[in-house]
């Protein structure tokens, strides 16, 4: 059995992005602001100091 998202030619990452957007769009107005804050991507890089 092949997953539906695979049959549609999507990767799992793209499928999960589409699902997350659909859930955020379906939220009530009072919860949308918090969901939009957490939907962004953030990366932190740390340089290792050699001693």
UniProtKB/Swiss-Prot annotation:
Alphabetized UniProt keyword annotations: Acetylation, ATP synthesis, CF(1), Hydrogen ion transport, Ion transport, Membrane, Mitochondrion, Mitochondrion inner membrane, Transport
InterPro entries xrefs: ATP_synth_F1_esu_mt, ATP_synth_F1_esu_sf_mt
Subcellular location: Mitochondrion; Mitochondrion inner membrane
Modified residue annotations for N6-acetyllysine: 21, 32, 37, 44
One Gene Ontology cellular component annotation held by this UniProt entry: mitochondrial inner membrane
N6-succinyllysine: residues carrying this PTM: 21, 32, 37
UniProt superkingdom: Eukaryota
Keyword Acetylation: yes
GO terms assigned for molecular function: protein-containing complex binding; proton-transporting ATP synthase activity, rotational mechanism
GO annotation, biological process: proton motive force-driven mitochondrial ATP synthesis
Assembly, per entry: Component of the ATP synthase complex composed at least of ATP5F1A/subunit alpha, ATP5F1B/subunit beta, ATP5MC1/subunit c (homooctomer), MT-ATP6/subunit a, MT-ATP8/subunit 8, ATP5ME/subunit e, ATP5MF/subunit f, ATP5MG/subunit g, ATP5MK/subunit k, ATP5MJ/subunit j, ATP5F1C/subunit gamma, ATP5F1D/subunit delta, ATP5F1E/subunit epsilon, ATP5PF/subunit F6, ATP5PB/subunit b, ATP5PD/subunit d, ATP5PO/subunit OSCP.
Family assignment from sequence similarity: Belongs to the eukaryotic ATPase epsilon family.
UniProt function note: Subunit epsilon, of the mitochondrial membrane ATP synthase complex (F(1)F(0) ATP synthase or Complex V) that produces ATP from ADP in the presence of a proton gradient across the membrane which is generated by electron transport complexes of the respiratory chain. ATP synthase complex consist of a soluble F(1) head domain - the catalytic core - and a membrane F(1) domain - the membrane proton channel. These two domains are linked by a central stalk rotating inside the F(1) region and a stationary peripheral stalk.
Stated name of the protein: ATP synthase F(1) complex subunit epsilon, mitochondrial
The gene coding this protein: Atp5f1e
């Amino acid at each position: 059995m092949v997953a539906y998202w695979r049959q549609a030619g999507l990767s799992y990452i793209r499928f999960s992005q589409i699902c997350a957007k659909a859930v955020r769009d379906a939220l009530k107005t009072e919860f949308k602001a918090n969901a939009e804050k957490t939907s962004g991507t953030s990366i932190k890089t740390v340089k290792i100091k050699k001693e």
